[in-house]
């Protein structure tokens, strides 16, 4: 099972586009894919044809704030073999809401591991679309993943950003 976070603190580098296209491509070769939209902008959600206006508890936000289980919020997409856990703007408040939780960086890892252990054969890949920052959400994705994919533009500032990301990791 590969859990891949597509990460870069810079916006507009193709993280969401990479997640959507990689997920769609892998699903076409009969791999079972779960996309987790961890970006409050919810572009992976809308890019895969779902609404990012859902009730917050029916999204990854509900999982991370403890009101829902992963199995409750997985949604089918129009693509066979491709499911998603959607996101919306309410996710941006999670950092403040969990400020007193010393284990908050591990919430996603714990919940995802429990779900995948119960459903090991359901998915071949989990792809996590990260927000354009080195925030709590990005740290949650980092500790939950066993692989990272870092899209870069071919410019100096992108390389500077990669250096910052490597230091964070």
PLM segments and residue spans:
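P-loop NTP-binding core
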Residues: 1-169
């Amino acid at each position: 099972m590969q859990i891949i976070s597509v990460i870069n603190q810079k916006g507009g580098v193709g993280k969401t586009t990479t997640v959507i296209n990689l997920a769609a491509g892998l699903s076409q070769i009969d791999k079972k894919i779960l996309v987790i939209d961890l970006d409050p902008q919810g572009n992976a959600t809308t890019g895969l044809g779902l609404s990012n206006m859902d009730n917050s508890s029916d999204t990854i936000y509900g999982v991370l704030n403890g009101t829902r289980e992963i199995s409750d919020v997985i949604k089918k997409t129009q693509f066979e073999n491709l499911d998603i856990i959607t996101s919306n703007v309410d996710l941006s408040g999670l950092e403040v809401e969990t400020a007193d939780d010393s284990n908050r960086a591990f919430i996603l890892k714990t919940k995802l591991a429990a779900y995948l252990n119960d459903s090991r054969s359901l998915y071949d890949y989990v792809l996590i679309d990260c927000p354009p920052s080195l925030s709590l959400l990005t740290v949650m994705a980092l500790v939950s993943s066993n692989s990272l994919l870092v899209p870069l533009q071919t410019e100096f500032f992108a390389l500077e950003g990669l250096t910052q990301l490597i230091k964070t990791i």
